């Protein structure tokens, strides 16, 4: 079955998705007594009774075996890698993004709520489309993509499907990436490490109570960031700055100081909130707030700070500069590269400082976005 008719009820979507599953990777769960299992795909580490699902609602226990989503997408699109955002990886390249349904958090401002909250919100009805990894990789090549990205919903809870796709992608010469809330576990990161090159974490707050409101905890995300860096994933971190929620100087300072404690070379993207989904009370984030967050990050010691979602309004904060001599290295307007000056080995052309990232030996120019819907 490839789609859900308009107006389908929640139970119908559940019934469809129950048929789009496979056994979870044995590395990602353990069997307990009384046909219970414990899942390690995300930081909730849910103990799941027979016949029940985890917090994510898409990983479930059937007779003592854990099942995970398989064989479909809830959305795909081809657009610049800068949109993910990754600013220190394959500048200007196209990223072929795919996602499934479900999430282990329930953020009230989620911009992808139609896919992430599809099993919690009766208004979030998305038709799952049956596909194979081979088809997705072929379509990525047709669109001119160089990176496959698991995104839109939370990819950790659909890691098995992402790995199946990434195995095909890497065999074909493509890079791979996760765009994630970072609520991981050591087991899932070990499972992903051979197949994932780039990893973006949404560090949504630096306050435990704020994370509780979103349905999670802060510490698993912080530990995931530490592990991602130590394990050699290329890591970039994004914080959506929301007025009245996470924009205080104190919270932003603690967050930036934490990132510096992992590495001052982690790119930190501070992005502007706009009213979405259920969060319609705060004002939209202005450029002055992003500039303040960037100044806090610089004071803490971060070398690469970017402001997003307000193209042309944030001055130099869309660009990459050498932290040693301040030479302009990559100039951007939104997702578009307007100038590129890095050397083939990723160095500043003036002082030869090595800029951390995953750089192409030759800048291949900016490619515009190409939306794609699978057939």
Where are the language model's segments positioned?
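Auxiliary Fe-S-binding modules of radical SAM enzymes
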Residues: 2-50, 249-375
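Short, cysteine/histidine-rich loop/knuckle motifs that typically chelate Zn2+
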Residues: 41, 55-58, 102-105, 109, ...
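Cys/His-rich metal-chelating microdomains
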Residues: 45, 49, 59-62, 106, ...
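Short recognition patches in nucleic-acid-associated and regulatory proteins
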Residues: 55-58, 63-69, 329-337
